[in-house]
């Protein structure tokens, strides 16, 4: 769905065009931006700049604060991990937003993800599942982040552990994630995450330094 913003001169701009000018601070556009946030949740799309603009408008206009939109923005920013979108969004929160119980729950979930305690995350996610039920693709976005961490941490991993880290998924779904990430089943309940040839190898670098380049420096040391 295309979102157009109506200007005072009667003309319309796209949200991206509006965000590139002073109109991004016009509270008259907040409802359109909030609708855009809801569409992102529904359609599994993401626009960080627009979402941060909403939080900034809340700062300037606290009486227009919408907590449901705040939750959606924060949860959508979690789907972009390992990027720092959540930190940027959190920095724009008002004191009343920070005191909100649901906001604190989302912040706790973010902390758990950042320290890679994925088993605990899925437990907390199950308890709070209604909070992000409306966000399409939320679980798979988190699994993509989990896969990123696994890929940078393990060479091989037990299949049962991988299944647990990905949220206790079905065996068929696990096989799909293994294939998606280019991993290999080794047998005996193990998954090869990184081949030996993919490991970082040391390399000796020889740099030729001409005497003229250091002559002046050596002269100063005499």
Swiss-Prot record:
It is found in: Cytoplasm. Signal peptide: none annotated. Residues 46-208 form the PCI domain. One of its GO terms (molecular function) is RNA binding. Transmembrane segments: none annotated. InterPro entries: ARM-type_fold, CSN8_PSD8_EIF3K, eIF3k, PCI_dom, Transl_init_fac_sub12_N_euk, WH-like_DNA-bd_sf, WH_DNA-bd_sf. Keywords: Cytoplasm, Initiation factor, Protein biosynthesis. One of its GO terms (cellular component) is eukaryotic translation initiation factor 3 complex. GO terms for biological process: formation of cytoplasmic translation initiation complex; regulation of translational initiation. It comes from the Eukaryota. The keyword Endoplasmic reticulum does not apply. Component of the eukaryotic translation initiation factor 3 (eIF-3) complex. The eIF-3 complex interacts with pix. HAMAP family: eIF3k. Belongs to the eIF-3 subunit K family. Component of the eukaryotic translation initiation factor 3 (eIF-3) complex, which is involved in protein synthesis of a specialized repertoire of mRNAs and, together with other initiation factors, stimulates binding of mRNA and methionyl-tRNAi to the 40S ribosome. The eIF-3 complex specifically targets and initiates translation of a subset of mRNAs involved in cell proliferation. This is Eukaryotic translation initiation factor 3 subunit K.
């Amino acid at each position: 769905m295309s979102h157009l913003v109506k200007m005072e001169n009667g003309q319309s701009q796209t949200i991206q065009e509006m965000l590139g000018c002073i109109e991004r601070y016009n509270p008259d556009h907040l409802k359109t931006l909030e609708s855009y946030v809801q569409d992102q949740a529904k359609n599994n799309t993401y626009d960080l700049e627009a979402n941060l603009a909403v939080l900034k408008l809340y700062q300037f206009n606290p009486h227009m604060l919408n907590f449901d939109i705040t939750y959606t923005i924060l949860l959508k920013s979690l789907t972009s991990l390992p990027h720092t979108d959540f930190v940027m969004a959190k920095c724009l929160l008002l004191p009343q937003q920070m005191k909100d119980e649901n906001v604190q729950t989302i912040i706790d979930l973010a902390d758990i993800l950042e320290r890679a305690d994925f088993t605990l995350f899925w437990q907390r996610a199950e308890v709070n599942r209604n909070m992000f039920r409306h966000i399409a693709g939320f679980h798979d976005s988190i699994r993509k982040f989990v896969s990123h961490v696994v890929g940078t941490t393990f060479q091989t991993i037990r299949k049962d552990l991988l299944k647990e880290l990905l949220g206790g998924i079905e065996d068929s779904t696990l096989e799909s994630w293994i294939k998606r990430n280019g991993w290999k089943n080794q047998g005996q309940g193990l998954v090869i995450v990184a081949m030996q040839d993919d490991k970082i190898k040391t390399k000796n670098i020889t740099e030729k330094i001409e005497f003229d380049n250091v002559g002046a420096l050596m002269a100063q040391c005499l």
